[in-house]
Amino acid sequence: MQPRRGEPYLLTPGPLTTAFSTKEAMLRDWGSWDGDFRAMTALLRSSLLEIAGDTAGEYDCVPLQGSGSYCVEAMLGSLIPRDAHALVLANGAYGKRIVTTLGYLGRACTVLDKGDYLPPRGAEIERMLDDDPRITHVVAVHCETSSGILNPIEEIAAATAKKGRKLLIDSMSAFGAVPLDVREIACEAFVSSANKCIEGVPGFGFVIARKSALREAKGRSHSLALDVYDQWDVMNRTGQWRFTPPTHAVAAFIEALRLFRLEGGQVGRLARYANNRDVLVAGMRELGFEPLLNARWRSPVIVTFFAPAHPSFRFETFYELMKQQGFIIYPGKLTVVDSFRIGCIGQVDEHVMRRVVEACANSLRTMGVGHAAPPAAALEERRTLAEAA
């Protein structure tokens, strides 16, 4: 796997490196009201429902223009009634963004804040739901890319269902690779985006929700553009988007779906991403780097590494040296220790990940960093996290 246009690999959790044929699909223009484009929209919706496991026809897929955060806000504003109360499970930037969004929407919420990188567990969710009968909805992030943690969504869903509440999931950086089957995970709705694990390009996201929840959402949204019910209703009646759709992004997504199926769907994609992660972690450990999370919680999407303790290490320099070798990495988002992140998704495989490790080694040599071991405090922090989880 090598970008044919010479651009660097994007080792980020989306936008990511896409296949050449996915880029090529954007070379044609499409009429947004034309029958051919309406057929593409219908194929997009049915394909995503198939990936979600909706064999009973209880759910529907509503694509929406904009970034993933637009879709998260649309889901929250359309599916949570104004007099409802949400429990937000937060362990990173995207859980906190949900809390901020609910504040803008005027929706009451309680927050279970697990810090930067601890997972919410079923037992504590059950206790909070028992203690607060006001709570009607639970909102969870599937993969929190701030740290790379894969939250236990099955456990969260079981706890929520046991207590008779409704679950909304931000599966932005997980759906398509990490299993999210609505036959096994009881949820009211979830959202994801074109430019994540399906490996499309930015431009739209989608809400997959129970049809009953969509019907109940009529007239509830705070926004015309982000009204999931109205988008759903118009698409079902006309096959069209209400406002100008991202035609080129949709065309690219159709090609990305074809490649997704050729790879074996969710199972095949997860296998490649998980292998990417394992090859990366093993190689980085040989250089002295240590991952933040233990294997139990480490997602196949992005891995957080502690920054080396060596006094000559500077992330800004490291970043530029990696970029010169053809790799764009991510800065860290932890509050306790210095870190950086490397993504494992997109058009990359184990051979690319070995080249990433080699580029890291070259960068360390250039910087005069003999060993990438983290400070003792970071390892102690990891030990504490492992015990707490």
UniProtKB/Swiss-Prot annotation:
InterPro entries given in the database record: Aminotrans_V_dom, NH2EtPonate_pyrv_transaminase, PyrdxlP-dep_Trfase, PyrdxlP-dep_Trfase_major, PyrdxlP-dep_Trfase_small, SP_NH2Trfase/AEP_transaminase
Source species of the chain: Paraburkholderia xenovorans (strain LB400)
GO terms under biological process: organic phosphonate catabolic process
Family: Belongs to the class-V pyridoxal-phosphate-dependent aminotransferase family. PhnW subfamily.
The name this protein goes by in its record: 2-aminoethylphosphonate--pyruvate transaminase 1
Function comment: Involved in phosphonate degradation.
Lineage: Bacteria, Pseudomonadati, Pseudomonadota, Betaproteobacteria, Burkholderiales
Subunit-level organization: Homodimer.
SUPFAM superfamilies: PLP-dependent transferases
Alphabetic keyword roster: Aminotransferase, Pyridoxal phosphate, Pyruvate, Transferase
Annotated positions of the N6-(pyridoxal phosphate)lysine modification: K196
Pfam families, alphabetized: Aminotran_5 (PF00266)
Gene name of the record: phnW1
